[in-house]
């Protein structure tokens, strides 16, 4: 069975944000505005997405 994934796109800058939020952005593999990555849909990834919801856009929920 294939693992479920979600596409995450960074839509706002991480500069000037909390250190923990910048860590979540890099933990998701995002590097710049407009960058899209496909990550496995796990509880830890969902937690990172929820923490930085205002900086990212999620597809495939």
UniProtKB/Swiss-Prot annotation:
GO terms for biological process: translation. One of its GO terms (cellular component) is cytosolic large ribosomal subunit. Keywords: Ribonucleoprotein, Ribosomal protein. GO terms for molecular function: structural constituent of ribosome. The keyword Phosphoprotein does not apply. SUPFAM superfamilies: Ribosomal protein L30p/L7e (SSF55129). It holds the Pfam family Ribosomal_L30. Belongs to the universal ribosomal protein uL30 family. HAMAP family: Ribosomal_uL30_B. Part of the 50S ribosomal subunit. This is Large ribosomal subunit protein uL30. It comes from Saccharophagus degradans (strain 2-40 / ATCC 43961 / DSM 17024).
